[in-house]
Design a protein with these regions (language model features):
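Feature activates predominantly on carbohydrate-active enzymes
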Residues: 1-85, 89-92, 98-102, 107-109
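Active-site cleft segment of glycoside hydrolase catalytic domains centered on the general acid/base Glu
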Residues: 110-115
């Protein structure tokens, strides 16, 4: 099945979960099926992949995934780890899986900033 949708992968202010859920609603209304969560300003999926989001964020993300799943929208997480930080990457993947996100992209853009 083709994946057609949006990538949240830009620099700038992070979107709220209300905004993300509105996008999921729009995707569903337009027969699209994919949302990649990969904002450049989220340090917990990039430079500080070894740290966890807040419990409140995790609860909101879990609800976001549930909402998307009900609308047949696949949520994927784009992770941009330090190139040698495999343990933290594995832990982050497991954390996202526990929140209902089971699809991932490993991104290597901007990794030179991690020195």
């Amino acid at each position: 099945m083709k994946k057609l949708g949006v990538v949240e992968g830009f620099y700038g202010s992070l979107m709220s979960f209300s905004q993300r859920n509105s996008i999921v609603e729009s995707l569903s209304n337009n027969n699209l099926n994919f949302y990649l969560y990969a904002p450049k300003e989220d340090p917990f999926i990039r430079k500080h992949i070894d740290l966890d989001h807040s419990k409140e964020w995790e609860e909101q993300f879990q609800n976001f995934c549930h909402n998307a799943n009900e609308k047949h929208i696949q949520i994927s997480a784009g992770l941009c780890p330090k190139t040698n930080d495999y343990g933290s990457l594995a832990n982050k993947i497991n954390k996202f899986k526990s929140l209902g996100c089971n699809h991932f992209a490993i991104l290597f853009d901007d990794t030179e900033d991690y020195d």
